[in-house]
Structure formats: C-alpha cells, structure tokens
C-alpha cells in the first residue's frame, strides 16, 4: 500500500462543499475520489486537510489517499486532470510515508477572503468574490482585524451547528489589506471553527460600515454567544489557500492564491 499527498485547486460554485454528502449531492471530495478510483482500478478514499462549505474555493487544498496501484506521479496528475471537471484540478502529487496524514499532521491552515468594493457588481467575478457596494472605512477595518490575533475563545464567531469540542484557537495573523478595489482578509491559525472566517469577515464589514466601534469586538468575545456578533459573510469570497506541515514532509509550496488577483505573498 502506497500513500500519496495531493494539492488540489477548485472552484466551489457547483459543489456542496468539500466533504462527501449523501448520494446525488455533488462534493469536491466525491468527485475526485470517483476519478482516482478509475485510474487506480480500486476504491480510493481521500482525506482532506480541512472542510469547506458550499461555494467556498481552494487554491491548495491538501489531501492524501492510499492505493496499491503503481503509477508515476505525472501519470496520476495527467490522468486525473483529463477526467476531472474543469473547475477541479490536481496541482501536484507526492509519494509519502504512511506517517503523513493530511489532517492530523497539519500545524496550521490559511484562508483569504476577497471583497470587491465598488458601486456595481462584477459580472466576470460572479461568485468568486463578495461584492459590497457601500463605502467602507478600510483603515478602521485594518485596525479591527488585528483584534482577532492571538489565542481566543471563538465561541461567538463559530456557527451554532459547529461540532468542534472546544472553541479556543490560536490565530497567528489576521491582516486586512487593500488591493485596488479589492479588500483581502488573510488569516492563519492552528485550526478553524465552522464559519469562523466568514463570521470574522462579517464583523469587519459591519465595522467598516460604521455599525459599531472596534472595541465592541472585546464585548463580542466576552459574550461567548453567536448571537452577540453580526452577519455571516457569504461563501463566495472565501479561499482555502495553504496548509502547513512539519518540514520533514517537504511538500510543494505553490504560490498563494487566488492567482487572478496577483497578490503579494
């Protein structure tokens, strides 16, 4: 039995998220498993580094699978990409020791959330960004983003249906920057709760619209109640961009996305 790690890029528009759903419901995981199973001529199960909601995208989702099939790495990539739908692409594959696990060996994960802030919605970026037409106080949002850095109880900023046993997470960085008409939230943490990034982005958007002051974030944290925070931002602008592992695994490090924005690393 051989273990492979894979890096996957996908648009989440047509899928009900990463994780396999009930029969007849399209998911990214199930779509890739079906193709890899054909190539391997045996059932393949993918184990992803994380889960994404319906409509959320990824530029480097890491996963792994085990197989008895012997193929060169290039053969796996070319074979899979020739059969996968155009909105899913295998970017790299690497043979690994069985010690590697895409989820349990990950030390951190990183997301970017992209807002297009302009009077009119962008037709060519439909469901690839979140459009906000209201004028935003960007400098205020930038200052507010740093409030989420460090170790906190994120009970207020997770979905009511979140199944995680405990809500404490360490956020290494939470930075918001402006790139022309785009606002980009870049956040890295040891782990994320269900809807955590989208709820943080929703909070920042409300601050940018003047609905409350930056210090109100402290009140939200203290409440430890989802009802104390504001909106959940749409999934459209959210991208899973990187997963980090110990150096011993030496996984490929592709450029951070989304690539069409040509953002700084």
Curated annotation (Swiss-Prot):
Keyword Isomerase: yes
Active site, per annotation: 53
Family named by the database record: Belongs to the tRNA pseudouridine synthase TruA family.
Protein name: tRNA pseudouridine synthase A
Gene3D superfamilies, per database record: Pseudouridine synthase I, catalytic domain, C-terminal subdomain, Pseudouridine synthase I, catalytic domain, N-terminal subdomain
UniProt keyword annotation of Isomerase present: yes
InterPro entries, sorted: PsdUridine_synth_cat_dom_sf, PsdUridine_synth_TruA, PsdUridine_synth_TruA_a/b_dom, PsdUridine_synth_TruA_C, TruA/RsuA/RluB/E/F_N
Pfam annotation, one family: PseudoU_synth_1
GO BP of this protein: tRNA pseudouridine synthesis
Entry EC number(s): 5.4.99.12
């Amino acid at each position: 039995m051989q273990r492979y790690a894979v890096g996957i890029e996908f648009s989440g528009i047509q899928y009900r998220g990463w994780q396999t759903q009930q029969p007849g419901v399209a998911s990214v995981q199930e779509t890739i498993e079906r193709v890899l199973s054909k190539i391997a001529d045996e059932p393949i199960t993918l184990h992803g580094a994380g889960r994404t909601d319906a409509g959320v995208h990824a530029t480097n989702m890491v996963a792994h699978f085990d197989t008895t099939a012997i193929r060169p790495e290039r053969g796996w990539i070319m074979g899979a990409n020739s059969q996968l739908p155009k909105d899913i692409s295998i970017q790299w594959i690497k043979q690994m020791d069985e010690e590697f696990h895409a989820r349990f060996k990950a030390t951190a994960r990183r997301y970017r959330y992209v807002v297009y802030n302009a009077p009119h919605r962008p037709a060519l970026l439909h469901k690839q960004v979140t459009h906000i037409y209201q004028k935003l106080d960007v400098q205020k949002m930038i200052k507010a983003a740093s409030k989420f850095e460090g170790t906190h109880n994120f009970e207020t900023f997770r979905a009511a249906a979140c199944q995680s046993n405990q809500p404490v997470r360490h956020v290494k960085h939470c930075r918001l920057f402006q790139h022309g008409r785009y606002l980009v939230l870049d956040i890295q943490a040891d782990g994320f709760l269900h809807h955590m990034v989208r709820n943080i982005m929703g909070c920042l958007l409300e601050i940018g619209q003047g609905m409350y002051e930056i210090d109100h974030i402290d009140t939200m944290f203290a409440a430890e109640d989802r009802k104390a925070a504001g909106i959940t931002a749409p999934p459209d602008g959210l991208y899973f961009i990187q997963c980090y592992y110990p150096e011993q695994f030496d996984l490929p490090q592709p450029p951070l996305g989304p690539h069409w924005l040509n953002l700084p690393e």
